[in-house]
Amino acid sequence: ISIINSRNIYVEGLITTQCPTGGSDSVTIRNVKAISSYGWGDGMNVFASNNVLFDGVFCRNSDDCTTVYATRMGFHGGCRNVTMQNSTLWADVAHPIFIGLHGDVERNEVMENLTYRNIDILDHREMQVDYQGCLAINAGDNNLVRNVRFENIRIENFRQGQLVNLRIFYNKKYCKAPGRGIENVLFKDITYNGDHAELSHIVGYDKERMVKNIRFENLKINGKVISDDMAGKPAWYKTSDMARFFVGEHVGSIVFTK
């Protein structure tokens, strides 16, 4: 099922392999299941589209379960107002949630006002470190990603990968330039129970292309809330160390609260 260059679309109750939305506006996808097993089997991609709602969907896919990209696949422009809620994701390969990779380097595109809430992530399995992350924002192609909210997300003991991956990067395999920035991202009521998570990464690119204004509220890992004032944290530790997050260069303002 493909929604292409369309407006005011409602899709409900279908089972398919993939359900991409490109160059479209005002789209609702409700109670749809996307299940794939072949290469490049992304579930529910969004390309250069605005005002898209996924509600009550299920994705088990052989590539990213759901993505938000700017210019890609013949669709042009940024993305605004994309919401996924009340849904379940199972990624046999790559990311459950992935934002930001593709865009038009000449247009400095923006992806903003993205919300993911009340979601269960059942699995994540990716051997390539560059493509790990249950909740992943990788800004490339001069894209700016901002105003993103992850809320009430429950992550089970996935097979292989990272919990969080926020990076401004220049992946020459897929991008023509690094991204411009990632900013104003909230992780609220995120729960992970398991022991397979590898080291998460939060890394900027340079002083002009930063990751900044990142907030974790009630991040709970194996029953322990990770906060700046948590009991048992040595004074010389970064709070991110307690979550097994690597915070690298060109990152500004990360807060962990109860």
Per-region residue spans from a language model:
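Extracellular/periplasmic carbohydrate-active domains that bind, remodel
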Residues: 1-258
